Design a protein with these regions (language model features):
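Residue-level detector of the short coil/turn that links helix A to helix B
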Residues: 6, 46, 91-92, 137, ...
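Residue signature of alpha-solenoid helical repeat architecture, marking inter-repeat boundaries
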Residues: 29, 71-75, 116-120, 160-163, ...
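Residue-level recognition of tetratricopeptide repeat
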Residues: 40, 79-82, 86, 124, ...
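Amphipathic alpha-helical segments of tetratricopeptide repeats
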Residues: 19-20, 59-67, 101-112, 150-157, ...
């Protein structure tokens, strides 16, 4: 039985032969395509330096073609700069930005029949580029990817599409939040939460979307708190805390630091609002996270005082 590793090694040998042959005698477009495919194989094998080298050679070919007035295949062009940008993310975010900005003018030319892509991979490309841009503080540059990603999703209503639509609106809200465009961010978070809440209540929200679901409540609450709308911010923070509590109860992965911060924040806001009982409830939850069995210790302390 052939393993995936054996399959990749055979594919690599095939493309080594193809690249060597095309470098000796072959069309520029064919060599470009072979380099992109070999780079993908090398990336899957974990040979990242060699993969980047192939992508840089491909970028050189693209530049030469553009100088000569030739147009490389749009799917191949996007794949080169997408993969190179992702590989630069950890080491050189400015280069990543340059790569992704090269893609933006090509977004309108992409569709489900584009070379190297189908509908789902176009959505994935849009989301992943946008995520890395937002994480690297290039929020504004993420918006063209998200706007196009929503178009790639179309009007379908299957669970995968609805999850990705909610994820895109959440990320768009985060981008607008980081840009200081708070009114737009609130609209984005509302769109995301309308979809995600329905999916969550019917157990159709997927794992990839859970983090975005919680952070949509948190960032929306941050904006409302900033705007002085304490009642709405408390409601959204409580929704985030409820989801995190549910994940903990189910034994699933959750952001413990975020959960602790939510309970602390809610305790403060509720105390400021004069709701002492609810404030103490969240304070106790925060204390239990920091000091396990703190409730038992408090009860024992009270019992000790009564004995005296």
């Amino acid at each position: 039985m052939r393993t995936s590793e054996t399959h990749l090694e055979e594919a690599l040998q095939e493309y080594n032969d193809k690249v060597n042959a095309l470098e000796a005698e072959g069309s520029t477009e064919e060599l470009l395509e072979a380099l992109v495919n070999r780079s993908t194989i090398l990336m899957l094998m974990g040979s990242y330096v060699s993969s980047i080298t192939d992508l840089e050679d491909a970028m050189d070919i693209i530049r030469e073609m553009e100088i000569e007035g030739k147009k490389p295949n749009v799917g191949t062009f996007v794949k080169v700069y997408e993969n190179h940008g992702h590989m630069c993310y950890e080491e050189d975010v400015d280069m990543m930005l340059d790569d992704f900005q090269r893609i933006i003018p090509k977004l309108s030319l992409l569709n489900a029949t584009t070379r190297h892509y189908d509908r789902k991979s176009l959505v994935h490309m849009s989301l992943e580029c946008a995520k890395e841009l937002v994480d690297a503080d290039f929020a504004e540059s993420s918006l063209p990817f998200l706007e196009k990603g929503l178009l790639f999703l179309g009007s379908m209503t299957d669970d995968w599409t609805m999850n990705r639509r909610a994820e895109m609106y959440s990320l768009m809200g985060e981008a607008h939040h980081d840009m200081g465009v708070y009114d737009e961010a609130l609209k984005d978070f509302d769109r995301s939460l309308d979809i995600a809440s329905e999916l969550y209540l019917s157990n159709r929200l997927d794992e990839d979307m859970l983090v975005s679901f919680v952070y949509s409540f948190v960032l929306k609450g941050d904006i409302e708190d900033r705007n002085g709308d304490k009642e709405k911010s408390i409601a959204d923070y409580e929704s985030a805390a409820d989801v995190l509590d549910q994940l903990e109860n189910e034994g699933r992965n959750f952001d413990r630091e975020l959960m602790l911060d939510m309970h602390r924040t809610l305790s403060r806001l509720l105390m400021e609002a004069g709701d002492v009982e609810r404030a103490e409830l969240h304070l106790m939850k925060a204390m239990k996270m920091e000091v396990p069995n703190v409730d038992i210790a408090i009860k024992n302390l009270g019992a000790g005082k009564k004995d005296h």
